[in-house]
Each structure stands twice: as C-alpha cells, then as structure tokens.
Amino acid sequence: MKRKQTIAAMNERGRRNEPFVFVIDFETTTAKLFRPDETDKIWWQANKQSNFARPVSEEKEIEWETKPVSFHQYKKGYDLVQHHIHNGDTYLLNYTQPTTVKTNLSPEEIFHLSEARYKVLLRDEFVCFSPEIFVQIDAGKISSFPMKGTMDASLPNAKERILNDSKELAEHNTIVDLIRNDLSLVAENVTVEKFRYLERLKTNQRDLWQVSSKI
C-alpha cells in the first residue's frame, strides 16, 4: 500500500473505531495494515498483548554465526559521520551497519525465542524486535520513551558509570530535547516526567543496563 492509500485506510479504520496493526518501511513509502487477530500473514506482540499462541519449546542446539562488516568499511562510514557533525549538518545520528547472520533457526523460531517486549514477524519477509516504545497514546495522552546509552551490567559499578558518563548525558539531553520538540507539534503541555532512569535488558550474550526517559 502506498503512502496516500495508507493514510486514507488508517483514517477510515479510525473513523469506524476499528483497531489495526500496521507495518511501515523506514522510508515511509510502503505500508501494510492488518486486523489485530490476523495470524496468517503477521505475528505481533506489544508488551503483554499479542495475536499468537506460544508453541511448546523444543530443546535445540542453536547455531548462530555473525559476520560484521570490515573495520575499514565501518570506519569509512564513521569518518563520514564525523565530517557532517563537525560541518554542523547534524548533532545526533544513529550510525549502524548490517551484520550477516548464519543460523539454523527459522524466522518463526527467532520470533518466539526473542524475549523483547515488542516484536513483529511478517511472514516470508522479516522478523523485528525491540525493547523500546516509540510512541504510546492512551486516553488522549501521547508519550515517548527514548532510550540512549547501554552498558554491560556485569561491569563493576556499571550503573554509576553509565549515569555519570558525560558523553552519554550529552546524547540523552539531545534526544530528549528532540522528542519533546516533536511531541509539541501534535500535543500541548509537553513535559519530561522521568529523566534518565535505568532498565535491565536481557540479550543472548549478556545483560545490559539501558538508560531511558519518559516524555
């Protein structure tokens, strides 16, 4: 579904007071809408709500081999980011690179094994999961919970180290200010209810301390 069709379909379902699940690509050019109870094309979980039945887990030795990009390729992008920051073109940027994964798990198995609060599986296309709420609307109140900064929870004094890190603080100040400004475009009386609180996240390698805010 294209952009204009998506907006029209969302508005129509909203007008009829019909809940729906939607998936949009990062360029916002293509989208898909589903009923919350559809399971043939999409599985989803949002906090404690979901549309799938959890299967009985089978003991299986998991094969998981990652192949990150080379240091040279990573540094090439990093240097470009630094150039634009020093040039004043941006002051906050999420720099990521793709990592190839070789595994004996199916997308469905990856979906079920993930302990993330939020996850979605679009059949024959992708699986995605995140610990983070982007935006939440409840009873006319819109909230966002930006996460910036992680640290290995097993490190000595990890909590104190991440909260006292000047780089992490500067990054968090920036994203909170950006999200607050964005919410002010669509809402009134925007406030920061919680600034820099810690959450413990479990990953397949180790536990992490994650710094969040509530706006």
Range-by-range predicted roles:
Residues 1-215:
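Extended alpha-helical targeting/anchoring segments
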